[in-house]
């Protein structure tokens, strides 16, 4: 029973932790993309 609980806890933590970092990475990527696009426009 302890093994199942540990596995369940680990899966729940991984599932909950996956969407959080993905969202953060997306936000940073989006910001970087916007900045790079602006820079390219300026160069032009």
Curated annotation (Swiss-Prot):
Induction comment: Expressed only in the forespore compartment of sporulating cells.
Spans through the membrane: none
Family of this protein: Belongs to the SspP family.
Name by which UniProt lists this protein: Small, acid-soluble spore protein P
Biased composition (Basic residues): 26-44
Annotated localization: Spore core
Primary localization: other
Keywords: Sporulation
Organism superkingdom: Bacteria
Disordered as annotated region, ranges: 1-44
Organism expressing this protein natively: Bacillus cereus (strain ATCC 14579 / DSM 31 / CCUG 7414 / JCM 2152 / NBRC 15305 / NCIMB 9373 / NCTC 2599 / NRRL B-3711)
Database matches in InterPro entries: SASP_SspP
HAMAP family: SspP
Residue ranges, compositional bias (Basic and acidic residues): 8-18
Swiss-Prot/TrEMBL GO biological process terms: asexual sporulation; sporulation resulting in formation of a cellular spore
